[in-house]
Structure formats: C-alpha cells, structure tokens
Amino acid sequence: MERFASPFGTVELTAEREKHIFLFHPEVRKERKHFPSTLAEPEVIRRSRFDPKVFILYRAIVQGKYLAIVVKTNHRNFILTAYLTRNIQQL
C-alpha cells in the first residue's frame, strides 16, 4: 500500500486498486509518476454527483489531457480509480 498527501489528508492506494486502474485504464500506467502531484496539488476538485464522499481531483499532465484521480473520503481515504480525460466534470 502506498500513501499520498492530499487536501483531504493522507490517501491510500492499495495493490488491489492499482491493479484495477492498470487493468481498466492501461494508459494511466505511464502517467503513474503524476499521482503524488495530482493528489497533493490538484488544479480542480469536483464532488461526485452520486456519492457526497467521493471527489475527483484533476491535474493537467500533457497538452489537453488531465489525470483524474477518484478518491473516497471517509475514516480511511483511498483511491477508487484513476483515468485520463480531456474534460473536467461540470458542476
């Protein structure tokens, strides 16, 4: 398990969640190095429309693309998934 600083405190990335991310979003593997900066200093944070304890943290990593990291906040903050996107979720 790896831990990262974030605006919500420490966030965990479990081996199971990392496996999920790389399986369903293989393009994220080469952008893994951007996880610490995206979590520590996101450019945009959006709350999920479906779960008030879930937030999406965005940070531009290449021209026109953002790394989006989805974090569940509760007694144990953890990463649900991560993906690349051209669009930031609208409020």
Where are these regions (language model features)?
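Ribonuclease/tRNase effector modules and their secretory precursors
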Residues: 1-91
